[in-house]
From Swiss-Prot:
Listed InterPro entries: ATPase_P-typ_cyto_dom_N, ATPase_P-typ_P_site, ATPase_P-typ_TM_dom_sf, ATPase_P-typ_transduc_dom_A_sf, HAD-like_sf, HAD_sf, P-type_ATPase_bsu_IA, P_typ_ATPase
Entry coiled-coil feature ranges: none
Subunit description: The system is composed of three essential subunits: KdpA, KdpB and KdpC.
Entry protein name: Potassium-transporting ATPase ATP-binding subunit
Amino acid sequence: MMRPVVVKEKRVNESHIHAVEDEVRQAKTMDRDIVKHAMKQSVAKLNPKVMIKNPIMFVVEIGFVITFILSFFPSHSSSIPGWFNITVSLILLFTVLFANFAEALAEGRGKAQADSLKQSKKDVFANVVKENGEIVQVSATDLRKDDVVIVKQGEMIPSDGEVIKGLASVDESAITGESAPVIKEAGGDFCSVTGGTMVVSDEITIVITSNPGESFIDKMISLVEGAARQKTPNEIALNTVLTSLTLIFLIVVVTLPIFTNYLGFQIDTAVLVALLVCLIPTTIGGLLSAIGIAGMDRVTKFNVLAMSGKAVEAAGDINTIILDKTGTITFGNRMAHTLLPVGNETIEQVGKWAAISSVLDETPEGRSVIEYVQAKSISYNRELAEQGEFIPFKAETRMSGVDLQDGTKVRKGAVGSVIEWVRSQGGTIPKDVNQKADFISKEGGTPLVVAVDNRIYGLIYLKDTVKPGMRERFEQLRQMGIKTVMCTGDNPLTAATIAKEAGVDEFVAECKPEDKIAVIKAEQDKGKLVAMTGDGTNDAPALAQADVGLAMNSGTTAAKEAANMIDLDSNPTKIIEVVGIGKQLLMTRGALTTFSIANDIAKYFAIIPAMFTLAIPQMEALNIMKLTSPLSAILSALLFNAVIIPLLIPLAMKGIAYKPMSSNALLGRNLLIYGLGGVIVPFIGIKVIDMIVGLFI
């Protein structure tokens, strides 16, 4: 009997292994394709019309052109050998190519995601309901906003819309990657459906909410492709600073021959170009775009769609997070918290009958009762319940339970309903039932009475339980200097209990939608940036007001349009990860900028003595690296300047390691690692390269 099971498990495991191996092979193939495409694009981006968008690398490209021309038409007064000019020009060319490759590689990852999304946009037909009731089949591309469409089991939802009739299970794996279907129904906050998803059961009628080219998938494709990627304010500000530095150094280098002529010696044009390239911040200039694109890519990998890079950056500067209690801090499902016996009954008796009444109950509450009883090691006869007839919960009876084969009737449900049922069986009501029910209600819980025939045994205290690990996560946010505010419709007593248990900094009890806007504005008036999550139409104003609004994909169209981020997994706690990604983006940009500028110190000690030692022998004192020769020093500095860009591409793409800590601690850590490291690494790198170059010249 056991042999077939073992074989089946083996086959399942083998098929699972093969599937994983296929995925790994596909991933490697895709990575190779992305790299090949990036290499081609790095050459295509040499077009001056493209390069001028990056002023720093554009200057390097001009330097390449000048030195390349000098390789064939050298100056008559030049004392530099011909091979030096061509070597410098090649190094500058590869410097530009490496920078272009970094940007193209980041863009390629986004385009790969866009291609997979395009595959989900299949040619489908829609059953459109005309005003006269006639059903006409048309192509999804012909649908317009406000068209009414019927979608049956097994059919693809043709475009974005909202359910106006019916209820169905929808497979959203093409969008979210989550295989479990979700329930969509008319009315409420779960009526929004997305084009490209599949109805797997029942039938729904939807009204189309977008025109062709404006659907959710279309927006996703446009965003991840980065075709219309706008630079963020911080990126523009940093780019302006770097461009200004480049302009200053350009003026210095152009005017330098005037001073050298006065001192009685000349500097070759190729050496001046090399000096300029070593002075300007080419490292961060070559990686800046890649860092921004990769930051958006990391958010997308978390199944979060950011409407702009500005939203991701804002997440990194967040000071306050507004969180709903239900579904975010707590499970949102009432879970069994404790058992309260009445009269002379015992907890074991209450647990036994509560479990028997819940064995066949598939609701979250019913399952939580079984889990609680098992955790408390209370024994009960499961087979007895399984052999009985399950009585499902109904709005009319407000009870559920089981009728056992021996005629025993077990019920659990609302206090008033069960008391009335017990009385109808001829039973009496213990005096402390209502007292204990009131206690649970005042605590913010839900009381369920457990009864068998004409006898009440006790109550189940259902509580909206705080998710595991929330206290630790809020502590991490606190270390980052971020305040958490919990909004809940519960009374102040219950809200205070949940807030204390979860570890949030503040709470707003009996909170209405308009109260959330007031909380957000109050924080913003203090100069703070605020993030919040939401899924309902009533959350839309607050999502729009927040600096970072994360809407749930399962929510309404209004909520998604108001937010600047959408979580495809509909997990409200993901706002914490989004904040982390935003901080990682800002830290990566800041760290590499620090590293790039610190690099220049070592380059100064390499190239300045090489330029002036012959005319000013005292400058030899600055040659602290004891480089082989002036030409070797210049080439070594240029080679390091070029090679460091591809070496830092993985760091720019992945982002620097981020640990929750205060801003001051973070600044000190990064200055130590990337500031001091940015000084030490070039000294070592240039010296090693010089030793190698010295073997050939």
